[in-house]
Structures are given as C-alpha cells and as structure tokens.
Amino acid sequence: MAPLRFSANLSWLFPELPGLPARLRAAGSSGFEAVEVAWPYAEQPEVLARAAREAGLRLVLINTPPGDQEKGEMGLGAVPGRQAAFRQGLEQAVRYAKALGCPRIHLMAGRVPQGADRIAVKAEMEIVFLENLRHAAGVLAQEDLVGLLEPINTRITDPQYFLDTPQQAAAILQKVGRPNLQLQMDIFHWQIMDGNLTGNIREFLPIVGHVQVAQVPGRGEPSSPGELNFPYLFQLLEDEGYKGFVG
C-alpha cells in the first residue's frame, strides 16, 4: 500500500508571494515534490518550466482558461455559443501542459448563463459539454494527456456552476466513454454538496484521476479547524489504492 503523494496548489498556497516562479521556489523549499496551478497563463511556459526544474518540482495539473472573467465566465466547456473559445483555450492549455510536462488538464465546465434557468438550459448545456469533451478527448489523446472533470459546489462557492455533483460528472463521463477523461475529486466540494464521503470515495475512486482537499467550511488547510477528519480520509484513500496526487 503506497503512501499518498501531495502536490502544492499554487493558486491557494503562498499567496503572499508575487508570481508563480516565486511560489514554485517556496513549494520546493517546503519539501513538495509536485505542484498544481489553475491558470498558469500569465507567465511564459518556458519560464515556469525552468523555475519548476530549478525547484525540483513536477507540475501535475493545470486548468483550461476561464474565459472572460470580467463577464462572469468561469470555464467554457458547457457554455452554449462558446465552443470555439473553449477549443482555443484547450489548445493553449495543451501547449502549456506539453512545455511543463504536465499530464492532466482540468476541463472547466463553466457557469449557467446569467439570467438563465438552470433546469431549462441543462439539456442544451450537457449536449454542448459532451461535444466539447469528445473533441477534447481526441486532442488530448494525441499528446498522451488526461482531461479531468471537477464538480464545484453550488451551495457556497459558485451557485451558477453547471457541473456540481460527482453523480452528474460520472454520468457525463459514461456518456462520453473515453478512457483519457476522468473525474477530479475535490473533497471540499463533495462534502458541501452531498456528504457521504466514504461511500462516494469508494464508488467513484475507480474513475478519479486527481484529488484535491481543503477543510470545510473555511477552505483552509486540512489541519485547520473544521468538520472533515482528514487522517481518516487520507487513510481511506490509501486503503482504496489511490495512486494519484492529492492537491
């Protein structure tokens, strides 16, 4: 039974340091072997690759670009009318992943359009998402990369996000049916939406390609006060044979 491997999420850790190169150095100095970052696109990939190398780190996860955040976008995968922008963002993410030696890309689903009713647009958004995911799976397969789907809770963090439960994400993955598309399990979001962590971890772990953790409700470090028993959860992941990284 292999011990868990941890990656520093530089979108959340070392916020006092400006720029990713400085955060990479801090992560290396803190003893991490791996890092992840949501959006590395403000820096040139060659600069980040060199900084990671010098810090003795491997990059294990990035996200597709969020889209136009000033207009409220947070990913484009399921957003009707934004298919071309999603595919352009995917190309950019693949370019960064190749330069950084990063094997996984979180394919962000995006938000229900402002003013739209979630129930009314759900079917259309799922059709768009399925089309984009089939395209992404083909692009990623050519580069030996894995795409990830992450449910984000709609109770606290992002009420408009389209993909919000592991059950919804797993059903979409089954419909796409591509082996290089997997589930990204953020225990913070799963606890808020559904609880039942032991059951859900055991049920969905076979299709999980990456795990993220934060305490609930404050989204602090696992050691911070909150409702989650991380020693138990980490042991459960080990016992169930999880071999990926925990961010």
Where are these regions (language model features)?
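Short, glycine/charged-enriched secondary-structure capping and boundary segments
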Residues: 22-24, 49-52, 119-123, 161-164, ...
